Amino acid sequence: MINRSAGFDFENIYTEMVGKYNNATFVEVGCFEGGSTVYMAELIKKSGKNIKFYAVDLFENYRPTNGQVSPSYKKFKQNTLRFAKYITVLKMDSVVASRQFADKSIDFVFLDADHTYKKVKRDIECWMPKVKDSGTLAGHDYTESSFFPGVYFPGVSRAVKGAGFDFNVDKSSWIKK
């Protein structure tokens, strides 16, 4: 069983996206050990919809911040094995992965990778053009203070606020309007 409780509070966003889109392309940037990836794959499987789902993460060479633990590709593969046919893994840097997609070709992108200001800003800049006009760009760990005990990522909040778009906040996730 995969422990999704540690910071996974965006089930409603994933559920809404699967309900909203058909014949779609989804990208999750930052997968850690696959808890949210499996959740999305389960939703896609149950929906019976034609949704291409890409999971983007370096899995290695990651410098954790705020006490985060470096993700393990081996653990990710173990956790996602039974849903492998629903997940295309892009084991690479987020910027490199974004170049694999044409502009305005993706229905839903969820950013939850490096939480430093510079990297979140870069991810928004790289992935925003890839999202269709009717699509959704969102991300995790938007907090003004410690949402979970001892967890606060000011870089995420600063990058999202500075991105120049309106957004809503749902628990600790941000969603571009």
Predicted regions and their residues:
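S-adenosylmethionine/decaboxylated-SAM
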Residues: 4-177
